[in-house]
UniProtKB/Swiss-Prot annotation:
This is Glucosamine-6-phosphate deaminase. Belongs to the glucosamine/galactosamine-6-phosphate isomerase family. NagB subfamily. GO terms for molecular function: glucosamine-6-phosphate deaminase activity; identical protein binding. Catalyzes the reversible isomerization-deamination of glucosamine 6-phosphate (GlcN6P) to form fructose 6-phosphate (Fru6P) and ammonium ion. Pathway: Amino-sugar metabolism; N-acetylneuraminate degradation; D-fructose 6-phosphate from N-acetylneuraminate: step 5/5. The gene is nagB. The keyword DNA repair does not apply.
Length: 262
Protein backbone atom coordinates (compact mmCIF):
# COMPACT_ATOMS: atom_id res chain seq x y z
CA UNK A 1 0.00 0.00 0.00
CA UNK A 2 1.40 3.35 -1.05
CA UNK A 3 0.62 6.48 0.97
CA UNK A 4 1.00 9.82 -0.77
CA UNK A 5 1.01 12.72 1.68
CA UNK A 6 -0.31 16.07 0.45
CA UNK A 7 -0.88 19.43 2.11
CA UNK A 8 -3.86 20.84 0.24
CA UNK A 9 -6.92 19.70 -1.73
CA UNK A 10 -5.26 21.15 -4.82
CA UNK A 11 -2.24 18.90 -4.37
CA UNK A 12 -4.49 15.90 -3.84
CA UNK A 13 -6.34 16.69 -7.05
CA UNK A 14 -3.14 17.07 -9.05
CA UNK A 15 -1.60 13.83 -7.82
CA UNK A 16 -4.85 11.91 -8.24
CA UNK A 17 -5.18 13.23 -11.76
CA UNK A 18 -1.67 12.09 -12.65
CA UNK A 19 -2.49 8.54 -11.56
CA UNK A 20 -5.64 8.54 -13.69
CA UNK A 21 -3.83 10.09 -16.63
CA UNK A 22 -1.21 7.33 -16.47
CA UNK A 23 -3.89 4.63 -16.71
CA UNK A 24 -5.78 6.38 -19.50
CA UNK A 25 -2.66 6.92 -21.58
CA UNK A 26 -1.16 3.45 -21.14
CA UNK A 27 -4.24 1.21 -21.44
CA UNK A 28 -5.78 0.53 -24.83
CA UNK A 29 -9.41 0.67 -23.66
CA UNK A 30 -9.31 1.58 -19.97
CA UNK A 31 -12.17 1.32 -17.51
CA UNK A 32 -12.30 3.75 -14.61
CA UNK A 33 -14.37 3.12 -11.50
CA UNK A 34 -15.86 6.46 -10.48
CA UNK A 35 -16.82 7.78 -7.06
CA UNK A 36 -19.07 10.68 -6.10
CA UNK A 37 -19.37 13.06 -3.17
CA UNK A 38 -16.80 15.70 -2.27
CA UNK A 39 -13.69 13.48 -2.26
CA UNK A 40 -13.08 13.26 -6.04
CA UNK A 41 -14.28 16.75 -7.02
CA UNK A 42 -10.80 18.21 -7.40
CA UNK A 43 -9.63 15.25 -9.47
CA UNK A 44 -12.58 15.63 -11.82
CA UNK A 45 -11.84 19.34 -12.12
CA UNK A 46 -8.27 18.47 -13.16
CA UNK A 47 -9.62 16.08 -15.79
CA UNK A 48 -11.75 18.88 -17.20
CA UNK A 49 -9.00 21.48 -17.00
CA UNK A 50 -6.47 19.26 -18.75
CA UNK A 51 -9.02 18.09 -21.33
CA UNK A 52 -8.02 14.49 -20.73
CA UNK A 53 -8.66 12.34 -23.80
CA UNK A 54 -11.38 10.01 -22.55
CA UNK A 55 -12.59 8.85 -25.95
CA UNK A 56 -11.39 5.29 -25.23
CA UNK A 57 -12.50 5.30 -21.60
CA UNK A 58 -15.43 3.38 -20.12
CA UNK A 59 -16.63 4.40 -16.66
CA UNK A 60 -18.56 2.45 -14.04
CA UNK A 61 -19.90 4.25 -11.01
CA UNK A 62 -19.79 2.87 -7.50
CA UNK A 63 -23.34 3.57 -6.45
CA UNK A 64 -26.62 5.42 -6.79
CA UNK A 65 -29.49 6.31 -4.49
CA UNK A 66 -32.72 4.32 -4.76
CA UNK A 67 -35.85 6.19 -5.92
CA UNK A 68 -34.05 9.43 -6.68
CA UNK A 69 -34.81 10.50 -10.28
CA UNK A 70 -31.79 10.86 -12.55
CA UNK A 71 -32.58 14.53 -13.11
CA UNK A 72 -32.56 15.25 -9.37
CA UNK A 73 -29.51 17.38 -8.60
CA UNK A 74 -28.57 15.02 -5.75
CA UNK A 75 -28.62 11.86 -7.85
CA UNK A 76 -25.28 10.46 -8.90
CA UNK A 77 -26.43 10.39 -12.52
CA UNK A 78 -26.82 14.17 -12.28
CA UNK A 79 -23.52 14.53 -10.39
CA UNK A 80 -21.56 12.66 -13.04
CA UNK A 81 -23.17 14.59 -15.88
CA UNK A 82 -22.37 17.88 -14.18
CA UNK A 83 -18.81 16.98 -13.20
CA UNK A 84 -17.59 14.96 -16.20
CA UNK A 85 -19.97 13.49 -18.73
CA UNK A 86 -21.18 16.84 -20.09
CA UNK A 87 -17.58 18.00 -20.48
CA UNK A 88 -15.53 15.06 -21.77
CA UNK A 89 -16.39 12.51 -24.50
CA UNK A 90 -16.30 9.08 -22.87
CA UNK A 91 -16.60 5.85 -24.85
CA UNK A 92 -19.27 4.49 -22.50
CA UNK A 93 -20.59 5.40 -19.06
CA UNK A 94 -22.51 3.28 -16.56
CA UNK A 95 -24.27 4.30 -13.34
CA UNK A 96 -26.54 1.95 -11.36
CA UNK A 97 -30.22 2.61 -12.02
CA UNK A 98 -31.81 3.36 -8.67
CA UNK A 99 -35.15 3.91 -10.41
CA UNK A 100 -35.31 0.36 -11.80
CA UNK A 101 -38.63 -1.42 -11.24
CA UNK A 102 -36.75 -4.57 -10.19
CA UNK A 103 -33.76 -3.57 -8.09
CA UNK A 104 -32.52 -7.13 -7.62
CA UNK A 105 -32.38 -7.58 -11.38
CA UNK A 106 -30.62 -4.23 -11.68
CA UNK A 107 -27.92 -5.47 -9.30
CA UNK A 108 -27.43 -8.58 -11.44
CA UNK A 109 -27.34 -6.46 -14.59
CA UNK A 110 -24.70 -4.20 -13.10
CA UNK A 111 -22.56 -7.16 -12.06
CA UNK A 112 -22.68 -8.23 -15.70
CA UNK A 113 -21.47 -4.79 -16.76
CA UNK A 114 -18.57 -5.02 -14.31
CA UNK A 115 -17.66 -8.49 -15.59
CA UNK A 116 -17.62 -7.21 -19.17
CA UNK A 117 -15.61 -4.11 -18.23
CA UNK A 118 -12.91 -5.04 -15.68
CA UNK A 119 -11.92 -1.93 -13.76
CA UNK A 120 -8.34 -0.74 -14.29
CA UNK A 121 -8.47 1.97 -11.61
CA UNK A 122 -11.15 2.36 -8.94
CA UNK A 123 -11.48 5.74 -7.23
CA UNK A 124 -12.72 5.59 -3.63
CA UNK A 125 -13.45 7.95 -0.80
CA UNK A 126 -13.79 6.67 2.75
CA UNK A 127 -16.65 7.27 5.16
CA UNK A 128 -16.17 8.32 8.76
CA UNK A 129 -17.21 4.81 9.79
CA UNK A 130 -14.88 3.23 7.24
CA UNK A 131 -17.48 2.55 4.56
CA UNK A 132 -16.42 2.35 0.92
CA UNK A 133 -19.08 2.90 -1.69
CA UNK A 134 -22.22 2.47 0.38
CA UNK A 135 -20.89 -0.71 1.97
CA UNK A 136 -21.51 -0.15 5.67
CA UNK A 137 -19.82 -1.89 8.62
CA UNK A 138 -20.76 -5.56 8.72
CA UNK A 139 -20.98 -5.95 4.94
CA UNK A 140 -19.45 -9.28 3.84
CA UNK A 141 -16.13 -8.82 2.10
CA UNK A 142 -17.28 -11.04 -0.78
CA UNK A 143 -20.48 -9.08 -1.46
CA UNK A 144 -21.50 -8.31 -5.08
CA UNK A 145 -23.51 -5.30 -6.23
CA UNK A 146 -26.44 -5.06 -3.84
CA UNK A 147 -29.17 -2.90 -2.30
CA UNK A 148 -28.25 -1.39 1.05
CA UNK A 149 -30.09 0.48 3.76
CA UNK A 150 -28.06 3.56 4.64
CA UNK A 151 -27.03 3.96 8.26
CA UNK A 152 -28.08 7.04 10.18
CA UNK A 153 -24.46 8.25 10.29
CA UNK A 154 -24.16 8.03 6.51
CA UNK A 155 -27.49 9.80 6.00
CA UNK A 156 -26.40 12.56 8.37
CA UNK A 157 -23.08 12.91 6.52
CA UNK A 158 -24.99 13.34 3.24
CA UNK A 159 -27.60 15.69 4.70
CA UNK A 160 -25.53 18.70 3.64
CA UNK A 161 -26.42 17.94 0.01
CA UNK A 162 -30.19 17.97 0.67
CA UNK A 163 -32.66 20.62 1.81
CA UNK A 164 -34.01 18.62 4.74
CA UNK A 165 -33.38 15.31 6.48
CA UNK A 166 -36.45 13.55 5.13
CA UNK A 167 -35.17 14.18 1.59
CA UNK A 168 -32.08 12.03 2.16
CA UNK A 169 -32.68 8.59 0.61
CA UNK A 170 -32.79 5.59 2.91
CA UNK A 171 -31.46 3.03 0.41
CA UNK A 172 -28.92 2.80 -2.38
CA UNK A 173 -27.48 0.41 -4.94
CA UNK A 174 -23.75 -0.07 -4.46
CA UNK A 175 -20.98 -2.10 -5.97
CA UNK A 176 -20.19 -4.71 -3.35
CA UNK A 177 -16.88 -5.04 -1.57
CA UNK A 178 -16.14 -8.16 -3.59
CA UNK A 179 -16.84 -6.18 -6.77
CA UNK A 180 -14.55 -3.33 -5.69
CA UNK A 181 -11.72 -5.74 -4.88
CA UNK A 182 -11.67 -6.98 -8.48
CA UNK A 183 -10.26 -3.64 -9.64
CA UNK A 184 -6.65 -3.90 -10.80
CA UNK A 185 -5.71 -0.73 -8.93
CA UNK A 186 -7.43 1.29 -6.20
CA UNK A 187 -6.99 5.01 -5.52
CA UNK A 188 -8.42 6.09 -2.16
CA UNK A 189 -8.50 9.77 -1.22
CA UNK A 190 -9.03 11.23 2.25
CA UNK A 191 -8.83 14.79 3.52
CA UNK A 192 -9.46 16.28 6.93
CA UNK A 193 -9.62 15.32 10.59
CA UNK A 194 -13.10 13.80 10.25
CA UNK A 195 -11.57 10.97 8.24
CA UNK A 196 -8.68 10.36 10.66
CA UNK A 197 -10.24 7.48 12.61
CA UNK A 198 -11.27 5.67 9.44
CA UNK A 199 -7.84 6.17 7.87
CA UNK A 200 -6.20 4.85 11.02
CA UNK A 201 -8.34 1.71 10.83
CA UNK A 202 -7.56 1.32 7.14
CA UNK A 203 -3.80 1.55 7.66
CA UNK A 204 -3.30 0.08 11.11
CA UNK A 205 -6.54 -1.57 12.17
CA UNK A 206 -7.57 -5.20 12.26
CA UNK A 207 -8.73 -6.75 8.98
CA UNK A 208 -12.42 -6.88 9.81
CA UNK A 209 -15.82 -6.54 8.17
CA UNK A 210 -16.64 -4.06 10.95
CA UNK A 211 -14.50 -1.57 9.00
CA UNK A 212 -15.14 -2.17 5.30
CA UNK A 213 -12.07 -0.21 4.17
CA UNK A 214 -9.74 -2.68 5.88
CA UNK A 215 -10.42 -5.11 3.03
CA UNK A 216 -7.97 -2.99 1.03
CA UNK A 217 -5.17 -4.30 3.24
CA UNK A 218 -5.40 -7.46 1.13
CA UNK A 219 -5.52 -5.72 -2.25
CA UNK A 220 -2.22 -5.91 -4.19
CA UNK A 221 -2.27 -2.37 -5.61
CA UNK A 222 -3.67 0.43 -3.44
CA UNK A 223 -2.61 4.07 -3.36
CA UNK A 224 -3.88 6.31 -0.57
CA UNK A 225 -3.66 10.08 -1.04
CA UNK A 226 -4.23 11.86 2.26
CA UNK A 227 -3.34 15.03 4.10
CA UNK A 228 -1.72 15.24 7.52
CA UNK A 229 -5.08 15.77 9.25
CA UNK A 230 -6.46 12.55 7.81
CA UNK A 231 -3.26 10.78 8.91
CA UNK A 232 -3.12 12.48 12.31
CA UNK A 233 -4.10 9.40 14.34
CA UNK A 234 -1.71 7.07 12.55
CA UNK A 235 1.58 6.08 14.11
CA UNK A 236 4.88 6.48 12.32
CA UNK A 237 4.69 2.75 11.65
CA UNK A 238 2.81 3.53 8.46
CA UNK A 239 6.22 4.13 6.92
CA UNK A 240 7.28 0.52 7.44
CA UNK A 241 8.52 -1.86 4.77
CA UNK A 242 4.98 -2.48 3.51
CA UNK A 243 4.21 1.13 2.74
CA UNK A 244 5.90 4.05 1.07
CA UNK A 245 5.34 7.64 2.13
CA UNK A 246 6.01 10.39 -0.40
CA UNK A 247 5.59 14.13 -0.20
CA UNK A 248 4.18 16.27 -2.96
CA UNK A 249 7.62 17.51 -4.00
CA UNK A 250 8.72 13.92 -4.59
CA UNK A 251 5.70 13.20 -6.71
CA UNK A 252 5.36 16.16 -9.01
CA UNK A 253 9.05 16.63 -9.77
CA UNK A 254 9.63 13.26 -11.41
CA UNK A 255 7.95 10.07 -12.61
CA UNK A 256 7.27 8.57 -9.19
CA UNK A 257 3.53 9.10 -9.37
CA UNK A 258 3.34 6.58 -12.17
CA UNK A 259 5.69 4.24 -10.37
CA UNK A 260 3.40 4.01 -7.34
CA UNK A 261 0.85 2.33 -9.53
CA UNK A 262 3.13 -0.53 -10.50
Amino acid sequence: MNILVVKTPEELAEVGYKLIEEVVKTKENPTLGMATGSSPLGIYAEMRKNKLDTSRVTTVNLDEYVNLPHEDKNSYHYFMQEQLFDHLPFKQTYVPNGMASDLEEECKRYEGILAANPVDLQILGIGENGHIGFNEPGTPFNSPTNIVELTESTRQANLRFFEKEEDVPTHAITMGIGSIMKAKQVLLVAMGAKKAEAVKELLQGEYSEECPATVLQRHPNVTVIADQEALSLCSEAIADEHRQVFTISDLLSDSRVGETAN
